[in-house]
């Protein structure tokens, strides 16, 4: 029976140093809570949620917990450069996740996390959500959490 090696074990066997974000790093938690005001947020409005440090591998365990919202409302969760504000991936963590009926949903279908991809930040990034499809309801609450691996 044949055995193959992961990218990390192959690199270690060849004498290369593997970064903590790829092997043996510390898992840390990202947490953001947002309570919308008395008015709605329009389609394409953004919510700045917080920062991830340089060298952070974004894990695939992100979730959003939310109170009842408007029918058809969805959000994207992405990241942009902290230094320049330039969007790196508008839906890198999650794309078109429904936040309508109160509940919880996974935020792991983003373009930087699916199809065998992973993402390690090359600079400090801002994590943000974009309102899609319908307005975010007045007084709606979102709690977003997920982990990343670093040092």
Which positions does each model-derived feature cover?
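Surface-exposed, low-hydrophobicity beta-strand/loop segments enriched in small/polar/acidic residues
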Residues: 2-151
């Amino acid at each position: 029976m044949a055995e193959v090696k992961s990218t990390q074990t192959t690199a270690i066997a060849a004498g290369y140093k593997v970064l903590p974000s790829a092997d043996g790093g510390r898992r840390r938690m990202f947490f953001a809570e947002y309570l919308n005001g008395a008015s709605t947020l329009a389609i394409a409005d953004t919510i700045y949620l917080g920062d991830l440090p340089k060298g952070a591998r974004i894990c695939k365990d992100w979730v959003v917990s939310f109170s009842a919202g408007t029918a058809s409302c969805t959000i994207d969760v992405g990241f942009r450069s902290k230094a320049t504000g330039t969007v790196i991936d508008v839906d890198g963590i999650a794309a078109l996740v429904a936040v309508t009926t109160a509940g919880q949903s996974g935020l792991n279908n983003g373009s930087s996390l699916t199809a065998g991809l992973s993402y390690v930040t090359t600079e400090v990034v801002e994590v943000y959500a974009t309102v899609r499809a319908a307005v975010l309801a007045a007084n709606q609450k979102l709690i977003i959490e997920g982990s990343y691996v670093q040092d």
